[in-house]
């Protein structure tokens, strides 16, 4: 069975829903369909269902630019975010465009017809071929099937429950049980207070090394007051602009004055702990924003640690035992449940096998043009959100650019666009930037590479991107456009796997 479509959006998470909404309002002449492998929209916010799941960015910047987040809550629960996305789906009538329980297996671009031939497996596990003019990959950057798990010595000896947050058991009973959470990132610092409040006998956060953690208010009182005296849209725009500036300011200051920011963060944590917990557990060896800065609402993590309901250990695992974890220091952590909050397994485009005329593509040897399109790959965009700000900010600017590009192609009568790569621009760093987080280090052999200069340099700077993409010319000598009747030989060939 073959099906001809115009634009194929892969993924109905926050990126896919955002792209679809922008296309609906900014390029309404283009038709699109959305493929979603799961039964529901939401992506990350449908997959992760562990206790306390929430955003780690403020919702005024995590919400879309076209739809105000109408709540004073700074951070939001996973269910609230799914509800917000459902509203977008309803407002833009997207439900009829989404094909649930459909999975893209492979995609081959045929240069003769200038079409993508996409192999799809439907809910009945029957294979179909969809023929698309343009693809937008909105699958995020991690493997939905499994998270990253280190090789824990003797793990099989453990008689309790071993859980990864990515696959949280429904109705897990942890009341009255001893829980050890391995990790110190956003997931771990969310789980500790949530499981403690949920009735666990004791929760221990076991970390190999400390992480910077900032406490932020759970309610944005300024925004709440503005909403009462200003139109909702204006209050949202002002709050969004303020928070974008604050985010960027903290990140920039961390790069330029790391000692100053470190001193401030550590002093803030010390005030939260009130001498009840040793500061060695919250004093990282790296500088602020060398890894992503984690946040907690109203210092909930520190409150739980002060109360004694939870504790933190900075150590390394010697091995698992039948009853818990033996640490290299000699200490034993008793556990009924162990949660491995050890990060994500990086994966691009949902693991789709991509080819051009049957020849495999290698994204790790490619760059991103304007942070949106893969070098030497025709008629495809890929959404990778910011690592130092809200993911959705990138979705908005990328969607605006994609809509402008498609409108330009329609006006000029073009069927194909290819960002022609310049290998002299290729760097060793990936587009994830200079962060040293474990999951980013593991992305080196998967992620597209950073470029030295624009338009190949991914800035991870929303304000810079918004200006650059809004004003970007399409006749820049890098984008190569073709019509179906064109026979002009391209200057470069797609990057292939040898």
From Swiss-Prot:
Report the domain of life of the source organism. Bacteria
Which residues does the annotation say bind FAD? 15, 36, 56, 62, 104, 395
Give the EC number(s) under which this enzyme is classified.
1.14.13.-
Topological relation to the membrane, as annotated: Single-pass membrane protein
A Pfam family that this protein carries is FMO-like
Question: Subcellular localization, per the record?
Answer: Cell membrane
Keyword Translocase listed? The answer is no
Q: Name one GO cellular component term.
A: plasma membrane
User: GO MF terms on file?
Assistant: flavin adenine dinucleotide binding; N,N-dimethylaniline monooxygenase activity; NADP binding
Key words, A-Z: Cell membrane, FAD, Flavoprotein, Membrane, Monooxygenase, NADP, Oxidoreductase, Transmembrane, Transmembrane helix
Similarity comment: family membership: Belongs to the FAD-binding monooxygenase family.
Q: Protein name, please?
A: Probable FAD-binding monooxygenase AlmA
This protein's encoding gene: almA
